[in-house]
A protein has these predicted regions:
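Conserved nucleotidyltransferase catalytic core and NTase-mimicking acidic/glycine-rich helix/loop elements
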Residues: 2
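A polyanion-binding, active-site-adjacent surface
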Residues: 5, 10-215
Length: 215
């Protein structure tokens, strides 16, 4: 079934065998709905950096407040800035398809957020000063959600969480840790749209995620 899902997602040219890896089951106390959403209410008018002056909407993140899987992107794009939700464009639709293929949805078992909560102008990379101002918010989200696995989507998210300025290919295929929580790094869905040859490796990453979490 997963082979067929892989073909449906990426086409026959990206077909690869599925390699099972033993999962590691972690148990953490989970927050109530009120804890994560009351935190959202307390910060959604943030003006700690210049991004707060130019945004349309603060994009806190969305999903299951008891998520096993926390996905972290780099920052909101144009559509996200207008709608106030993460990953709502073409890249978001691709991400939804990948999640569905491993038995997840953004409303069940998954929470999606970004390194910065406001759109950088012209979709540029967030500046170090902007990341610094926003990082306490992500830290608090992680503390409240207590995911079993964090997955950084793309180079910016990866190097921010790892605190290492290295190539994405050097971050992949290794389990790192963020505040004792396992952390993996994979390609951002937008990169897959620009370079379809990355889809096969990304699918392997999500197979690992599925097996790690025991889906």
């Amino acid at each position: 079934a997963f082979i067929n899902q892989h073909i449906d997602l990426f086409g026959k040219e990206f077909y690869s065998d599925i390699y099972k890896k033993p999962g590691i089951r972690l148990t953490n106390p989970k927050p109530t709905n009120e804890s994560i959403f009351s935190f959202k209410s307390s910060i959604e008018n943030c003006k700690r950096c210049n991004l707060g002056m130019t945004r349309n909407k603060f994009v806190f993140g969305s999903g299951d407040p008891k998520a096993d899987l926390l996905l972290v992107g780099e920052g909101p794009g144009e559509k996200e800035d207008l709608q106030g939700e993460p990953f709502v464009g073409r890249a978001g639709k691709l991400l939804d398809r990948i999640l569905k293929a491993i038995g997840y949805t953004r409303k069940k078992k998954v929470f999606i957020t970004n390194i910065v909560k406001c759109r950088p102008p012209d979709n540029r990379d967030p500046l170090p000063s902007e990341v610094k101002e926003c990082s306490p918010y992500l830290d608090k989200q992680i503390d409240l959600i207590k995911p079993k696995l964090i997955v950084a989507l793309g180079r910016v998210a990866g190097k921010t969480l790892l605190q290492k300025d290295i190539l994405l290919k050097e971050m992949r295929n290794e389990t790192h840790y963020f505040n004792s929580i396992p952390l993996r790094v994979t390609y951002h869905p937008a990169a897959l749209l620009r370079n379809p040859s990355l889809k096969n490796e990304t699918w392997k990453d999500f197979q690992y995620i599925r097996d790690f979490l025991g889906s």
